[in-house]
Amino acid sequence: FYNKPNSEFTYERRDASTAYIPEGEGRYYYAGGLSGGCTKAYLKLCTTICSWVDRDATNHIIPIWHDESLINKYFLDNPPAITLPPAYLYPEGWSLPFKPIILIRDKNKPEYGGHEFLRRKNSLWVKIKLICQKIKLAD
């Protein structure tokens, strides 16, 4: 969302979710793939988001981008001390006016194994785990 208006950000727009961000609010869109900080502040972020996940689960809501939606809501209410530039999560194949520092690989590319392989869906590893579970149940 580099150089885009916040109306194009894919924030959670359902007001029943703890991740809800109203139209017109928000200055940045934070990617969930890279985060960190001082211990106390980072643990506060983690415990807050954990409680929001529990609250949304109780209400049968999953934010549009899961934890990333919650991180955006958290940073809207608690602006971070430092916001890294987009070069730190530069999507592969994009043309942006700066050099990438951390490149996000396109998980759908076959040379990386594809999305299912990377998420271990329908992989040999999943099948082995299921067989092991069945063996334990049979004992």
Region locations from a protein language model:
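Secretory-pathway lumenal glyco-enzymes, predominantly type II signal-anchor Golgi glycosyltransferases
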Residues: 2-6, 100, 104-119
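Residue-level marker of intrinsically disordered, low-complexity segments enriched
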Residues: 19, 99-102, 133
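Membrane-proximal basic amphipathic "stem/tether" segments
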Residues: 110-139
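Generic alpha-helical secondary structure signal
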Residues: 13-15, 24, 46, 78, ...
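Catalytic core and acceptor-binding pocket of nucleotide-sugar-dependent glycosyltransferases
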Residues: 24-108
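Conserved donor-nucleotide/metal-binding helix-loop-beta segment in metal-dependent transferases, i.e.
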Residues: 1-19
